[in-house]
Amino acid sequence: MEYLKFVLYGLIQGLTEFIPVSSTAHLKVISLFLGIDDPGASLSATIQLGSVIAIAYYFRNDIFNFRSQSSKKFLEYLFHERLLRSIFIGTIPIVLLGGSIKIFIPSFFENVLRSNLSIALVSFLMAFFMYLADSSKRGSINIKNHNFSNSFLIGIFQAFAIFPGVSRSGVTISSALISGWERGDAAKFSFLLGMPAISLAAIVEFVSSFNDFFSLGFFPLFVGLITTFLSSLLAIDFLLKYFSSNGLKIFIIYRVIFGVVILLNL
């Protein structure tokens, strides 16, 4: 039964990290509704790592698209590669905002912004923002022709995903659509942009709960990691195909229902 809990956490993380509904909110709320423990920082860090590995594996040709070259040329290639530079630029805002919160308002963040009421209200706000994105005119910006200001703008919106209930994929895909991206590439760039952001979040969780790793044990964490990895791959593959010809409507409706359910159970 204990291992089923880790499988559940892995499924929730893997699916909701990429489906625009907020993984943090679902991990917290579903744990509360089912009467099971909050996954905690150590488990959260491990299962987030599963999502990062899934992104790296799924997009391995985009990230490591090189033929046999010397190490020096490969490093030069990485440094000058447009996509990787865009991801780096888009990650800057969330690093600055996340660091500021950790330094200046850590208690307010944990006690107020992570409350169920806050998550419900944020879910409604995100539903409205996603509606604006879904209603916007289809654009022509894509992975190949975007510029660094495009990636930085999306990165600014990604920074708000620090707040529970926002959904990193939801806010980045929506902001990309509003700023003129094609649907399929908006989702693809969102997932790629998530690699450093999710990795940094996992590192912060790991550092803050290092001792807890030893109490949980290796095998339960491994179960959570593998479950997250597999469910993340399924979510990425499904959503890239889905967004190539569909909008955000179904997720907008879900976010409204999710917010209402939380409010009714306060």
Swiss-Prot record:
GO cellular component: plasma membrane
InterPro entries named among the record's database cross-references: UppP
UniProt keywords, alphabetically: Antibiotic resistance, Cell inner membrane, Cell membrane, Cell shape, Cell wall biogenesis/degradation, Hydrolase, Membrane, Peptidoglycan synthesis, Transmembrane, Transmembrane helix
A single GO BP: response to antibiotic
Residue ranges of the TM segments: 39-59, 86-106, 112-132, 147-167, 189-209, 216-236, 246-266
Domain of life of the organism encoding this protein: Bacteria
Reaction equations catalysed: di-trans,octa-cis-undecaprenyl diphosphate + H2O = di-trans,octa-cis-undecaprenyl phosphate + phosphate + H(+)
Chief subcellular location: membrane
Membrane topology according to the record: Multi-pass membrane protein
Localisation per UniProt entry: Cell inner membrane
Enzyme Commission designation: 3.6.1.27
A Pfam family matched in the record: BacA
Top-level class of the enzyme under EC nomenclature: hydrolase
Molecular function (Gene Ontology), one example: undecaprenyl-diphosphatase activity
Function noted in UniProt: Catalyzes the dephosphorylation of undecaprenyl diphosphate (UPP). Confers resistance to bacitracin.
Leftover remarks: Bacitracin is thought to be involved in the inhibition of peptidoglycan synthesis by sequestering undecaprenyl diphosphate, thereby reducing the pool of lipid carrier available.
Family that this chain belongs to: Belongs to the UppP family.
Name of this chain's protein: Undecaprenyl-diphosphatase
